[in-house]
Amino acid sequence: MKKKVVLVQDNKEILDIMDQVLEEEGFDVTASLTTAPIEKIDEIEPDVVVVDDHIKGSKRGSEVIKELKSDPQTETVSAVLTSTSSSLPRQAEDCKADDYIEKPFDIDHMIDVVKKNA
C-alpha cells in the first residue's frame, strides 16, 4: 500500500514540483496551498505531513504542526516543517516536528526526509 503524504506549501511551483517528485517515488500525495487537507486529516490518514511555515491563512505551519502533535488523535503522524528561515532547526524542535527541510532544497534530500518519516 502506498504511503500517504499531505503537502501544504506557500508557493504553487514548489508545491507542484514536490507533488510530482513524491508521486513518482510511489507516494499517494494530497497537495494544497491551504490547510484544508490538515482539517480533513482523519479522512486522509497520512503517514507524514510536510508543511511550510509561511502558509497562507491565519496560522503558521509551525502552529499547525504543534496542534497536530498535541492532539492524541494525530500526535503519531510524522510532521516535517519547511522554510527558508535560518532558525528552522529551532522552530522545528519548538513545534515538535519530526524533521525539517530547508529551502531551497535538494530534491534527493527532500525525498530522503519524506521517506525517512513516512
Regions found by a protein language model. Give the residues of each.
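C-terminal output helix
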Residues: 105-114
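Hydrophobic alpha-helical motif in two-component signaling modules
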Residues: 41, 50, 64-65, 74
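Acidic, metal-coordinating helix/loop segments flanking the phosphotransfer/catalytic sites
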Residues: 31-48, 56
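Alpha4 helix (beta4-alpha4-beta5 surface) of REC/receiver domains from two-component response regulators
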Residues: 63, 85-102
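Conserved acidic carboxylate
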Residues: 9, 83
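His-Asp phosphorelay/catalytic-motif detector in bacterial-type signaling
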Residues: 47, 72-78
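Two-component/phosphorelay signaling modules centered on CheY-like receiver
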Residues: 11-30
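Conserved phosphotransfer microenvironments
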Residues: 51-68
